[in-house]
Amino acid sequence: METRAPYVLIGTFVLAAILAVFGFIYWLNNTGGIGPRTNYHVQFQGPVPGLLVGAGVLFNGIRVGEVAQLGLAPDNPRFVNATISVASATPVRADTRVGLDFQGLTGVPVVTLEGGMIVAKSGEPLTLIAEAGAGQSMTQAARDALRRVDSVLEDNSGPLKDTIANFKTFSDGLARNTGKLDGILAGLEKMTGGGAPAQKITYDLRTPQNLGPAAKTLSASLAIPEPTAVAMLQTQRMLFAPVGDNPGFADFLWADSIPKLVQARLIDSFENYDIAHAPLRTSDLGQADYQLLIDIRRFRIATDGETRVEIGLSARIVDKNGKVVASRLVETSEKLDKVEPAAAVAAFDAAFARIAKELIGWTVLAV
């Protein structure tokens, strides 16, 4: 008898512990369990898929109770009556909104309560009416939406077929007239100023060839650096005086900026005069005995009075020590019968040929 006593005590302790654990779990599941509770009747006007006795009741997202009872309405089997038991401190009102929510990945249903301002009359049992479609899950909502779409498509199958046929006819017409459409679009781009920009046309200044026999050659080395000029002359565009709109020259470009072009053609002219004693560029190797410094004063088309091209240069010959040996102005003009790029370039060629011939003769005498 004495041997069995410890086993009885141990068994009693184990049973008590098991009961305590179950009681604790029940208390947790019922939000404290022993607190005062209030029951409310809830009526759902449709199915409540998955809702079970013991399911949670949430007020503004906070668990306040559970579903105590479920059943069908005796007067209308489509309705579902439920009894919820919530903590008495929960501010349930006569206009509190009731719904059904599905939580988690598995979609566990819970009863949801939200808001409410109207206080129910004392003594009257409070019945809450759930919102229409409160028990509708996302799957059911999607199924109903697809069913409605299918119904709409079925009712309008004829017009839809006609619309698709019209699209096909329109598409075939576009395919047959692709070339014409490209032309129309190109015309619209031109009309609206769009499309690719116009291609610029480059013009060169011709080097004079017939400079006569070299009666006198350069007796010392000569360099011709890039001429100086004001900013307006540092351009490849055709210049006009006075400045105006000349649409015929919108796409006109000299082969290089005016100072570099004048330098290159002057050196070419000296080479054509006497290749054996041709001048150097300042970037060439070695230091020349003299430099021919050019400042461009005019290189333009003048439209005041008789239309003409004008070239004006100031020239100075400087020795190694920076001393000016000789200087002079060289200016000329050429009548321009027609203000267009080809005629203008021909006039510049003629004027530059006179400038180059005069500079060469003056330079070989001064050096």
Swiss-Prot record:
Pfam families: ABC_trans_aux (PF03886), MlaD (PF02470). This is Uncharacterized protein bll6063. InterPro entries: ABC_trans_aux (IPR005586), Mce/MlaD (IPR003399). It is a single-pass membrane protein. It is found in: Membrane. It comes from Bradyrhizobium diazoefficiens (strain JCM 10833 / BCRC 13528 / IAM 13628 / NBRC 14792 / USDA 110). GO terms for cellular component: membrane. The chain crosses the membrane at residues 8-28. Keywords: Membrane, Transmembrane, Transmembrane helix. It comes from the Bacteria.
